[in-house]
Regions:
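N-terminal pre-domain/capping segments
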Residues: 1-85, 149, 241
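Hydrophobic faces of well-ordered beta-strands that scaffold small-molecule active sites
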Residues: 3-7, 33-35, 57-62, 87-89, ...
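Acidic-and-aromatic substrate-binding clefts and catalytic sites of carbohydrate-active enzymes
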Residues: 11-16, 34-45, 63-71, 94-100, ...
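Distinct, well-ordered alpha-helical segments
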Residues: 14-19, 44-51, 72-76, 102, ...
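Acidic/histidine-rich catalytic cores of soluble enzymes
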Residues: 118-197
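Active-site clefts of carbohydrate-active enzymes
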Residues: 183-191, 212-224
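H/E-rich (His + Asp/Glu) clusters that bind or coordinate divalent metals
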Residues: 195-203, 210, 214-216
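Aromatic-rich peripheral "rim/lid" segments of glycoside hydrolase catalytic domains that contact
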Residues: 221-241
Length: 241
């Protein structure tokens, strides 16, 4: 399993100096990154920074509309340049918790999945905690009505008392790429791996059973992001590899 980081974690540093941030993450031991949002960074510049540090951009949290209509081919050219393997969707509660809007979202994601497949890019869905509201109806609805990979976020799910073990038992074979986020019932997201409430031994077991390929660390605390990134990659190696 390769260790990566969601660049949202280091967003403040990334906006100040992308090249230095990528270099620092590589020195910590990260092998790949997951990007997010729009495509304000020049694709050549990003690809060159990653190549210079023997890193890759394995996945992207991309706004769905960038993969539709007139924006599709420009987005695909960008993805090809940076060598993307996974395109992952993440959606707010205003859509996820509305039955009609969620049904429309599922249709759109399914269409984009089919459009990306010929390019060799797999699609997935990244959960927050609101997918587990309403007795987990949104989470189950998405997984029952699509074949998207499940980029399961351990911390977000734990906030709503769900675990990777439970999710994988219901929907096996979808855990190629996982989000490794600590969460504590006492401190919420203000914690690190090994000081939190996530059962990392269970996560490791499921990751191996489901043949996970990428473990992507994410943290919410932007001001201490680089310290968190360094501390937690050491914990990922200790607890998950």
């Amino acid at each position: 399993m390769k260790l990566g980081i969601q660049l949202y974690t280091v967003r403040d540093f990334l906006s100040q100096n992308m090249e230095d941030t990528i270099s620092s993450l590589a020195k910590m031991g990260y092998q790949t990154v997951e990007h997010f949002g729009g495509f304000s960074c020049d694709a050549d510049r990003l690809a060159e920074a990653l190549s210079a540090n023997n890193m890759s951009c394995v996945s992207w949290h991309a706004p769905l509309h960038y993969l539709e209509n007139d924006l599709f081919f420009g987005t695909m050219a960008y993805f090809k340049r940076v060598g993307l393997k996974y395109c992952v969707f993440t959606v707010g509660p205003d859509i996820i918790l509305d039955n009609e809007k969620r049904a429309d979202l599922i249709k759109r994601m399914d269409a984009v999945q089919k459009a990306l497949a010929p390019y060799g890019i797999k699609t997935g869905y990244h959960n927050h905690w609101w997918e587990f509201d309403q007795d987990a109806l949104p989470f189950n609805d998405i997984n029952k009505n699509t074949s998207l990979l499940m980029e399961f976020d351990t911390g977000n799910a734990m906030k709503n008392n769900w675990t990777l073990e439970k999710a994988a038992a219901l929907y096996p074979g979808r855990q190629e790429i996982l989000h490794i986020k600590p969460y504590s019932f006492e401190k919420e997201f203000n914690c690190d791996m090994g000081e939190d409430s996530v059962d990392w031994a269970a996560v490791k077991k499921v990751a191996r059973e489901q043949n996970a390929q990428y473990l992507i660390f994410e943290h919410e605390d932007a001001p201490t992001a680089m310290q968190r990134a360094e501390k937690n990659i050491a914990m990922m190696k200790k607890l998950l590899l």
